[in-house]
Amino acid sequence: MSLYAPIAAIATAPGRGGIGVVRISGPDLAELAQRLFGRPLTPRHAHYLPFRAADGEVIDEGLAIYFRAPHSYTGEDVLELQGHGGPAVLRRILARCLQAGHDLGLRPAEPGEFTRRAFLNERLDLAQAEAVADLIDASSEAAARGAMASLSGEFSQRVNDLSDRIIHLRMLVEATLDFPEEEIDFLEKYQARPTLQALTHDLDTLIAQARQGVILREGLHVVLAGKPNVGKSSLLNALAGDDIAIVTPIAGTTRDKVVQEIHIDGVPLHIVDTAGLRDTDDAVESIGIERTWKEIERADLILHLQDVTQPPDHLDAQIVRRLPARTPVLNVFNKVDLLDAAFQGQPDSLAISARGGIGLDALRQHLLQLAGWNPGAESPWLARERHLHALQQAAQHLEIATEHAREDDRVLDLFAEELRLAHEALTGITGKFTSDDLLGEIFSSFCIGK
């Protein structure tokens, strides 16, 4: 499969709509436009034209826009045909384009291939390319703003600034190593230690902001766990603001997980209602309980719901013992509206009434705190786990470099190597140093047509 052959795809989402777009990218598309329309197209002008089949039948009418390289999304020639958004019509337009461009090597695009070409042609760096997919997938205004900040290059600029400063330090170290006869005290003359301290401080700041970006993009997987009839389904409905889960007084009503995404201050939380945990002979309910424990194992946060009107029993103790130690657990005592006296809760617990709405605002804010979200922080750009991992790797190498800078013998070659590794970690974020396997994994997650 040639990376330079022209490609085509329907660029709009599946289904019916007012407008649908067929996008083509590749070299020398002026010839293809001539074949499709029998006339040349003026670059960057919208032409209202009929879209015809090979036998002259009019398939649709719409706008044809030709973008000449390099002034296009991909950096190649791009031809966009904007017609009506019916699936059958768009498939016919795409088929006609592929037929007309067959001898030119025109083929259907792979998922994410248009954006991959934009990256390879240096129209976008890798972090910006990922932001395209994040903008498409954004499920809240905050996530959309964060994705747009990344797409505009805000995150990449911060990474590039740190990379440039590390390169400058490396250059000075290498010069010192290459010309030992000059007897230059590198660490003193070029103030390497304070420079390194400033670098480390700025990188730590970037890591903290990246954590916020990861939370905004990926959210938190929150599992509601507890015995039957403690109010798990009622709490899910209260947080969602809708009757998502069935609520009855019958124990064991919920037998399989119910997942609902909610947003608190723009942060996505994936709330999972689960089957009540108890000993049972019911085969179907037993399957649901086993699935509950699997959900608990993969949770980012567990809300252990308990009924304040019922005293704890051996089953509560069994549940607590089996909860994974590595996962944060918030004890939530429900149905406080049914008590005659004020409830005296435990430390690190919350008292609520899912049906009465008592304590739900406090619960929402507590969820954000446990997620690590800082509402007072600067509005973040979106980040991915791989970005955060790369930043943390760079920080580790700078920490080791700092240790070498403190040594009396000043082992500059080791100092230089740690700077190189820190720089390599940072450039992996923007794609200046990235394996083909990683590129394939990233762009394969895109939708076709983008």
UniProtKB/Swiss-Prot annotation:
Exhibits a very high intrinsic GTPase hydrolysis rate. Involved in the addition of a carboxymethylaminomethyl (cmnm) group at the wobble position (U34) of certain tRNAs, forming tRNA-cmnm(5)s(2)U34. It comes from Bordetella pertussis (strain Tohama I / ATCC BAA-589 / NCTC 13251). K(+) binds at residues 229, 248, 250, 253. GTP binds at residues 229-234, 248-254, 273-276, 353-355. The lineage of its organism: Bacteria, Pseudomonadati, Pseudomonadota, Betaproteobacteria, Burkholderiales. One of its GO terms (biological process) is tRNA wobble uridine modification. It comes from the Bacteria. Gene3D superfamilies: P-loop containing nucleotide triphosphate hydrolases, Probable tRNA modification gtpase trme, domain 1, tRNA modification GTPase MnmE domain 2. (6S)-5-formyl-5,6,7,8-tetrahydrofolate binds at residues 23, 80, 123, 450. This is tRNA modification GTPase MnmE. Its cofactor is K(+). Mg(2+) binds at residues 233, 254. Its main location: cytoplasm.
